[in-house]
């Protein structure tokens, strides 16, 4: 398979590869089954735990839902008018009934968490849309703890600059048990998580924070194989995070 994918993920029956302009679907023998060209700037995808559908999100505010059997586009829509910077990840609920997507709707510096029903991908609600100076960068469901975790940033009302970095649980669509990180811990965790959800591809690694931050931060001087071996998760990050705020002074 000679194509250079930004994202390459799979389940027990199919693999999905994203080049940015084409969504490829393969069987587990590497045979190409479909090549969808419905989107541009498409770098993120996630497969339902039920194995029946998958979602692709673009950085320019669009989303497409595809079925595996039959292989076809089910729905495509624009979820935001913000064109650019829509590269935060997304996740299905463990029962496959709901879908959570981190989205920017008013500014790339502010996010909300959109919740959709997966039977028709209608919008259920937009969580945290009323929060100012608030940005999520990652969401993950952890099977071991049966809980969602989110990674985020709070901004100072005075300077409008980031001054608090956190990882929290999402329970009943509310943030609870917030724990705190240093700026460096949050940035490193976000960099690893972005590679994880993209399937640790070489292309994603080459254009990640690991490409340029290694020049001044030794934590980033590691190989892609070493990053995979970290077995990184937001649940583990939360477990080891501080229970008291680590706030950057204005």
Model features per residue range: what roles?
Residues 27-29, 68-70, 118-120, 171-173:
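Short loop/turn segments that connect beta-strands within beta-propeller blades
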Residues 31-37, 72-80, 122-128, 177-179:
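A short beta-strand motif characteristic of beta-propeller blades
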Residues 2-5, 191-250:
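Sequence/structural signature of beta-propeller modules
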Residues 10-11, 49-50, 94-95, 143-144:
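Residue-level detector of Asp-centered blade-edge/turn motifs that repeat once per structural unit
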Residues 2-8, 40-47, 83-91, 131-141, ...:
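Repeated scaffold domains used in trafficking and secretory/extracellular systems
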Residues 18, 57, 102, 151-153:
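Residue-level marker for isolated small/hydroxyl-bearing positions within beta-strands
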Residues 20-22, 61-65, 108-114, 157-167:
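Structural motif
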């Amino acid at each position: 398979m000679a194509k250079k994918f930004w994202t390459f993920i799979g389940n027990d029956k199919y693999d999905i590869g994203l080049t940015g302009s084409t969504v490829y679907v393969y069987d587990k023998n590497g045979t190409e089954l479909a090549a969808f060209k419905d989107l541009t700037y498409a770098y993120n995808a996630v497969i339902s735990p039920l194995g029946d559908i998958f979602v692709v999100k673009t950085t320019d505010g669009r989303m497409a839902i595809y079925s595996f059997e039959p292989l076809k586009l089910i729905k495509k829509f624009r979820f935001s008018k913000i064109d650019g910077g829509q590269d935060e990840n997304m996740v299905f609920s463990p029962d496959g009934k709901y879908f959570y997507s981190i989205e920017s709707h008013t500014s790339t510096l502010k996010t909300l968490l959109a919740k959709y029903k997966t039977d028709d991908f209608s919008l259920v609600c937009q969580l945290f849309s009323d929060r100012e100076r608030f940005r999520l960068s990652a969401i993950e469901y952890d099977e071991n703890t049966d809980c969602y975790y989110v990674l985020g940033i709070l901004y100072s009302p005075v300077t409008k600059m980031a001054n608090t970095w956190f990882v929290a649980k999402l329970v009943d669509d509310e943030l609870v048990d917030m724990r705190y990180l240093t700026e460096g811990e949050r940035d490193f965790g976000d960099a690893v998580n972005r590679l994880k959800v993209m399937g640790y591809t070489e292309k994603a690694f080459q254009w990640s924070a690991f490409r340029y931050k290694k020049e001044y931060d030794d934590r980033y001087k590691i190989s892609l194989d070493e990053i995979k071996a970290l077995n990184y998760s937001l649940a583990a990050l939360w477990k080891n995070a501080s229970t008291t705020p680590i706030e950057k002074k204005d």
